[in-house]
């Protein structure tokens, strides 16, 4: 779980994997990770989930159930490559408009290229900004989605408050994130795979294992399902619930602005 403390310089510190760093330093370090993996982001998620992330993302969009009518707007945060946004637009039969926000320009570049190739440029726009300081007016969006991104935010509580602010009354919050495995045997197997295999495979495939080591550590430091659900509730959301996937390797959290 991410816990903030005060640094010697007087600022707040937070978790960067298993390390303690200042909030500003974490953002810079995380940006560097995603600059390195932007062009191989799908491969990264395949390694982290043994390919299951594709099924989890499909399940996320199914639970969101975007309406098949014009004018419905979703904000997909930390969604630079467009993976979730494109699924949502497709599920709405081309009616939804998705704003993809990411703090990392390299990830957004990949997303813009993909949108153009898929013919979805008219249904999407890409914004480089911070999840803790969303550049949108109150009550702008019908839904807010974030997949495998919230654990990389230095101040998760601030990001959740911003999510609540930009949603319209009746709006939906959905967060897909790696979580705490709740099956004992699977827990040990996944831990061994994560800490031993993933960084080595990442280095072999991309030439740099450090980003993968951070991502594995960031999962271990993230709040478990119950604690994260409590954080969502504290941000103001109602009807908060979650669903586990693959024994808790991932969890999909839902909340409503009522």
From Swiss-Prot:
InterPro entries: SAM-dependent_MTases_sf, UbiE/COQ5_MeTrFase, UbiE/COQ5_MeTrFase_CS
Catalytic activity annotation: a 2-demethylmenaquinol + S-adenosyl-L-methionine = a menaquinol + S-adenosyl-L-homocysteine + H(+); a 2-methoxy-6-(all-trans-polyprenyl)benzene-1,4-diol + S-adenosyl-L-methionine = a 5-methoxy-2-methyl-3-(all-trans-polyprenyl)benzene-1,4-diol + S-adenosyl-L-homocysteine + H(+)
GO biological process: aerobic respiration; menaquinone biosynthetic process; methylation
GO MF annotation terms: 2-methoxy-6-polyprenyl-1,4-benzoquinol methyltransferase activity; demethylmenaquinone methyltransferase activity
Key words, A-Z: Menaquinone biosynthesis, Methyltransferase, S-adenosyl-L-methionine, Transferase, Ubiquinone biosynthesis
Ligand binding (S-adenosyl-L-methionine): 81, 102, 130-131
Pathway named in the protein's UniProt entry: Quinol/quinone metabolism; menaquinone biosynthesis; menaquinol from 1,4-dihydroxy-2-naphthoate: step 2/2; Cofactor biosynthesis; ubiquinone biosynthesis
EC number per UniProt: 2.1.1.163, 2.1.1.201
UniProt KW Hydrolase keyword: no
Gene3D superfamilies reported for this sequence: Vaccinia Virus protein VP39
Family of the protein in this entry: Belongs to the class I-like SAM-binding methyltransferase superfamily. MenG/UbiE family.
Biological role: Methyltransferase required for the conversion of demethylmenaquinol (DMKH2) to menaquinol (MKH2) and the conversion of 2-polyprenyl-6-methoxy-1,4-benzoquinol (DDMQH2) to 2-polyprenyl-3-methyl-6-methoxy-1,4-benzoquinol (DMQH2).
UniProt-recorded name of the protein: Ubiquinone/menaquinone biosynthesis C-methyltransferase UbiE
């Amino acid at each position: 779980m991410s816990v903030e403390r005060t640094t010697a310089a007087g600022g707040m510190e937070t978790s960067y994997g298993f390390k303690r760093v200042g909030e500003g330093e974490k953002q810079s370090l995380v940006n560097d990770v995603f600059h390195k993996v932007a062009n191989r982001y799908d491969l990264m998620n395949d390694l982290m989930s043994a390919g299951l992330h594709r099924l989890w993302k499909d399940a996320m969009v199914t639970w969101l159930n975007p309406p098949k009518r014009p004018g419905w707007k979703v904000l997909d945060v930390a969604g630079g490559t467009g993976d979730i946004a494109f699924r949502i637009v497709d599920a709405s039969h081309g009616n939804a408009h998705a704003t993809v926000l990411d703090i990392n320009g390299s990830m957004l570049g990949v997303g813009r290229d993909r949108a153009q190739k898929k013919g979805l440029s008219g249904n999407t726009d890409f914004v480089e900004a911070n999840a803790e300081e969303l550049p949108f007016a109150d009550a702008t969006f019908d839904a807010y989605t974030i997949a495998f991104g919230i654990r990389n935010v230095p101040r998760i509580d601030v990001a959740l408050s911003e999510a609540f602010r930009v949603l319209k009354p009746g709006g939906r919050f959905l967060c897909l994130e790696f979580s705490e495995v709740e099956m004992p045997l699977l827990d040990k197997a996944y831990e061994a795979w994560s800490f031993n295999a993933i960084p080595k495979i990442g280095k072999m495939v991309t030439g740099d294992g450090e980003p993968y080591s951070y991502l594995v550590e960031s999962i271990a430091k993230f709040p478990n399902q119950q604690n994260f659900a409590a954080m969502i509730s504290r941000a103001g959301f109602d009807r908060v619930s979650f669903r586990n996937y693959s024994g808790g390797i991932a969890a999909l959290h839902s909340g409503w602005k009522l």
